[in-house]
Amino acid sequence: MEVGSIREKIIVALLIYRFGEANVETEIPITEPEVDVKSFGHPISIKTITGKGLAGVKLIWTVDAQKAKEFCENYYPKCDMLLVQVNWNDTGGFYYIPLNVQKRVFDKLSRKNYIRLPRPGTNPRGVEFTKEALSNLVGDSESRNILINWQRTKIEFNPYKRWVDLWRKD
């Protein structure tokens, strides 16, 4: 879960850089469903995926089968979405999917073909968009994208060193 939160923070930092701190609201409760940030007062959901294909993007993270079922029964898109596909050493993208596109695709495909529930007895960690839904969302003429060539660079980093050094000072 922390990996997702860190990825979201990187995207939010990009919004702050581009639009200014005054126009990006970051104090959104973690319990707020779907909304990760507000830009110019508009709620935005941030989704990230790593890999070549647009599959496995979570609508909600949960291992509780009942909670997943309830979410599926009650879900309807409620905010714009930023979808970031990281495809290391290859091309991925940064997609903006407006709320009206999500609603249109949801209504066209139906709940059953938009949402993929976890299979009983597995531990997939959440409810996902179907591949068909994602394909329709990113392919819509009103959605926008920036293709990104993701190059992984080697960074020597020890996350414990800073703290060990600080403890040594005391």
Predicted ranges, named:
Residues 1-34, 38-170:
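Nucleic-acid endonuclease domains
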